[in-house]
Amino acid sequence: MPLRGLAKAKNFTLGPTAPMKTFTENVHSQNNEINNLKKIDKTHNLTNNSQNEKLYKYESQIKSSFDRIVPTLKEIARIQHHEDFINTAQSISKQNLGINLPTHILDKSWVKPLDMRALYAWCAFKQHEKLSDNFFENDPLEGSFGSPNANNFETALLDCGIHLLDITPCSDGRLAHSVAYVMRIPFSAVRRRSHAGALFDIENTVNRWVKTEHKRYRENNPNEAHEDTRYLKIVTYHFSSVDPLHQGCAAHGSDDKLAAKEGSEKLLAFKEAVENSFCCGASVDLMLIGLDTDTDSLKIHLSSSDGKIDLENTISSLDIYNSTINFSKDEAEKEICQIISGNSNKVQLKGLDKFVYKLIVNNISQIDYVKKFHKGSYEDIGHAERFIGVGIGFKEVHLRNLTYFAHLDTVEEGAPDLDVGVKIFTGLNVSQDLPIPIVIRFDYSGKVPGAKERAAKDCYRVNNAISIRYKSLVDKGLLHTCLTIRDRDNIHSAQIIGMSLDQKTKEAH
């Protein structure tokens, strides 16, 4: 893929930057922890090694399918004037990528140079289609609705006093795997919507809370309304321990203190909105988590005595990993319990303490995942996404640096998120004369009459707005779009309803 190597460069940045806070000692401490991690040639006794092997196999399979696009197109470009070019090109594409190329583009190779930009975008879109088909048909992450993993996790959530888990990670592609990999949560058991800087829309989140509580009253789903459980809202911001000055959150100028502060403010505003708008003690639980995008370790912020989020006091999963690496399983579990609650018996853990315990144990497996398969710290410390996902949906995307998310209903309201994504891909792709692939998605409920048609209209509306906002890129063939819809009430993959690459029909005269 283009410019993937630049993601390794420590001075490479595409987002806006700002003066960093003075935390030199913390940076040195974090780097020392990473160096120590790399030296330890053993896995933690709490690590799920078999799960790690499955997850790595899936990650390798999907990413390699995208990374083979450029070498394949280079091979095809060299033979575009050969005899029987179209059949040979299709054979190469089928063998290397498992897809067919658009004949209406290949057909023109005898009169003008092959449109490699169009072919690149086509391949990216078709690989996403294959990813979606595989995800919903085969459940490679074993986290679909009704699966044993999902059922067990939902039961565990209720046992923690949580009836719904709602997570907002930053839209940065380095957090796209935060649910299924970093936290090891079955994707169907969590509500996930990414936003730049993890700065979610408060009104929309209140509306989702209302729908959740309504289902409890009307359907006893996931539990009865009188039961003492809460809606848990989590914000996941991110930082870089390897290059904190440049590879942190672009929306916050790589200032992780600012990212944590604004994430906390959003959470508290959401809680206040619920409490001010509804009676009878209505409230929610909150959690702020920092994710180190280099090691996938977590910093979980604790609640202060007045119920607010403590920005300074955190539990570090990497610290726990390093301090318990030589412990037996039982000893490590007791130590984690002691750190969380002050007692060493996990049976005595209650509520959010029990949930935090589960997160830390799960994340220890991910720390070992990065340690084993990525030498303790990811080589691509910066952006290396393969396409931009725009709209509402993308349940199937759970891999690091695969997709930059811009969740939106309209381009106007989602412009800040989308502009950041286009800026990132200007460095990754446009600088290499390759286009920005944008997959537009609107999920719909098949139970609602006319919902499918409205979702399709939303796709075309957003597509038109994108073509206007980024007209100069579109006119040069440096931005292409793929329009998709999906019925979220069924286990079906996304359906492509149109592309900017579709063959244009001649007008009748």
Curated annotation (Swiss-Prot):
Per the entry, which co-factors are needed? Zn(2+)
Q: Does the keyword Nuclease apply?
A: no
* UniProt: Zn(2+) binding residues: 170, 238, 249
Q: Where in the cell is it found?
A: Carboxysome
- According to the UniProt entry, the coiled-coil residues are none
- Protein keywords: Bacterial microcompartment, Carbon dioxide fixation, Carboxysome, Lyase, Metal-binding, Photosynthesis, Zinc
Q: Does the keyword Transcription regulation apply?
A: no
Q: What is its EC number?
A: 4.2.1.1
Q: Name one GO molecular function term.
A: carbonate dehydratase activity
This protein's source sits in the domain of life called: Bacteria
The catalysed reaction is: hydrogencarbonate + H(+) = CO2 + H2O
- EC top class, in one word? lyase
**InterPro entries referenced in this protein's UniProt entry, alphabetically:** Carboxysome_shell_carb_anhy (IPR014074), CsoSCA_C (IPR048620), CsoSCA_C_sf (IPR043066), CsoSCA_cat (IPR048539), CsoSCA_N (IPR048619), CsoSCA_N_sf (IPR043065)
- State the Gene Ontology BP annotations: carbon fixation; photosynthesis
Summarize the subunit comment: Homodimer.
Entry protein name: Carboxysome shell carbonic anhydrase
Q: Which organism is it from?
A: Prochlorococcus marinus subsp. pastoris (strain CCMP1986 / NIES-2087 / MED4)
What broad taxonomic lineage does this protein's source fall under? Answer: Bacteria, Bacillati, Cyanobacteriota, Cyanophyceae, Synechococcales
